[in-house]
Amino acid sequence: MNEFTLNAEQRSDLGKGASRRLRRLASLVPAVVYGGDKAPESISMLAKEVAKLLENDAAYSHIIELNVGGQKQNVIIKALQRHPAKGHVMHADFVRVIAGQKLTAIVPIHFLNEEAPVKKGGEISHTTTELEVTCLPKDLPEFIEVDLGALEVGDNVHLSELKAPKGVEFVALAHGTDLAIANVHAPRIVKDEAEEGEEGAAE
């Protein structure tokens, strides 16, 4: 059984007012499924099922089996609209996955060996925490690993330095953009203490 599944029903009552009623009265999340040379499909899902699925971070970059009224189709999450204060999902966009056709998806970055630069006196800043990739469905990675173990204070990592998994292409690089991924800098508190020491000496 696929670990990543969602049950849904088609909905014909559309519009912002209808979506609000779904969320308020029936604890449902409105959503749209599109792509794959088929017409967009408006659906609704139980909010508790959506929340349970998203407890697994891998769901954000994994192919999901969506069961709409008994008809199964493979999709990926394209976008989620969340409540600004409470954080729960208010609306979802899914894109159909077609075997043999490349897809574009957002994949999280997993940073490895972060303790090494910290032990050398550095602080790590994550400039980018997810990457847009394009690949065939069978090659879709759940995450991209970035090893920070060899970094020294003052070092940084750019997208061009990462090795993409087999069959995977980084969209930003394809468009000529070399994203900054992470950097190691000296702790700001050291600078502040030095300035305070200078001020004390001046007095």
Curated annotation (Swiss-Prot):
Record-linked Pfam families: Ribosomal_L25p, Ribosomal_TL5_C
Gene Ontology MF, one: 5S rRNA binding
Cellular component terms (Gene Ontology): cytosolic large ribosomal subunit
Any one GO biological process: translation
UniProt KW Ribonucleoprotein keyword: yes
Coiled-coil region(s): none
Gene3D superfamilies (UniProt xref): Ribosomal protein L25, beta domain, Ribosomal Protein L25, Chain P
Keyword line: Ribonucleoprotein, Ribosomal protein, RNA-binding, rRNA-binding
Superkingdom assignment: Bacteria
Family: Belongs to the bacterial ribosomal protein bL25 family. CTC subfamily.
Subunit structure, as described in the record: Part of the 50S ribosomal subunit; part of the 5S rRNA/L5/L18/L25 subcomplex. Contacts the 5S rRNA. Binds to the 5S rRNA independently of L5 and L18.
Biological function: This is one of the proteins that binds to the 5S RNA in the ribosome where it forms part of the central protuberance.
Entry protein name: Large ribosomal subunit protein bL25
Protein's organism: Pseudomonas savastanoi pv. phaseolicola (strain 1448A / Race 6) (Pseudomonas syringae pv. phaseolicola (strain 1448A / Race 6))
Name of encoding gene: rplY
